Amino acid sequence: MAKEKFERTKPHINIGTIGHVDHGKTTLTAAITAVLAVAGDTELMDYDAIDNAPEERERGITIATSHVEYETATRHYAHVDCPGHADYVKNMITGAAQMDGAILVIAATDGPMAQTREHILLSKQVGVPYIVVFLNKEDQLDDEDKEEMLELVEMEVRELLSEYDFPGDDTPIVAGSAFQALEEAKTGTLGEWSAKIMELMDAVDEYIPEPKRETDKDFLMAIEDIFTIQGRGTVVTGKVDRGQVCVGDEVEIVGLKDTQKTTVTGVEMFRKEMDCGIAGDNCGVLIRGIDKEAVQRGMVLCKPGSITPHTQFEAEVYVLTKEEGGRHTPFFDNYRPQFYVRTTDVTGSVKLQEGTEMVMPGDNVKINVELIAPIALDEGTRFAIREGGRTVGAGVVSKIIA
């Protein structure tokens, strides 16, 4: 566990990069940390450290969700670099769920692509409240029609955002080149391309408000990963959804199996020890007397009695169209997809409500769901509906039945 204390001096915001594969999300993440490091606000992370899951570099696509931290003059950011490839939408869902806002990266050379649309939709469904746009690869546009191209892409992006109920007309859009900015920062001086990155971060500072932290609500953290620390016990990691967790607190582990009670013996963030983790923090929580095998991804850590496991609920869902990457055909009563809740997939069967014969791609309907395993649920819990690894719908729990 960590030894250094984490100091809270600036407001803390969770942010991330989203967008189509190879439009430059990871390069931008590296450029932001590099430029801010030269500006004196941040320690440097190199590109490979961000693109750090072993399977990534063979295929040149980012698979795992990487976390980096950086600071602007006014804020501390935890930044997730979200996977861009459609195969990895599952990670996109866990990653995007950790954002107070997102930077949508679009190559000015291509304009919005299939996954640009998919990520905007997913951002809407998983509750990413604000998007700032970076038009990347400006250096690759021809000088004579550069202005025109940028204007065209900008118009297209604003329309696309509005289509998914984001305020397209008011969204900040900054053009630049992440690659050129990164090259500049490597020399230790900031030039015109770095200035674009600073402009982007100013837009992020101003446009993405400090989230209303849900610190006063009952503690809940979705468990993403589980480790054993020799001689100390079991550590569970995840993002604190709401409330706070402090050393000495009694907590429950809810979902999938019988509810277990335990006590928190340590909390850490970015390898630094803390007394408490609060809503919005990505942290590790050390729990007493619980075997690693007794905990799995998809369970939640929570204040005792605050949330209970359920298998049956009513939900409001949106079914993706074929164009959005969804089903090509309708589904009927007793349809059995996977329901992706917080950090895990659980199979469930769908009961259509009276008067509904079938559900077409593009429909927005109320359905009843029965899961094969209990999950910690309450009204307002969001989920994705998936089939064979691809997202075919999204929904929110409107009523608990059992």
Curated annotation (Swiss-Prot):
It is found in: Cytoplasm. Mg(2+) binds at T26. The keyword Protein biosynthesis applies. GTP binds at residues 19-26, 81-85, 136-139. Pfam families: GTP_EFTU (PF00009), GTP_EFTU_D2 (PF03144), GTP_EFTU_D3 (PF03143). One of its GO terms (molecular function) is GTP binding. Its main location: cytoplasm. Monomer. This is Elongation factor Tu. It comes from Sulfurovum sp. (strain NBC37-1).
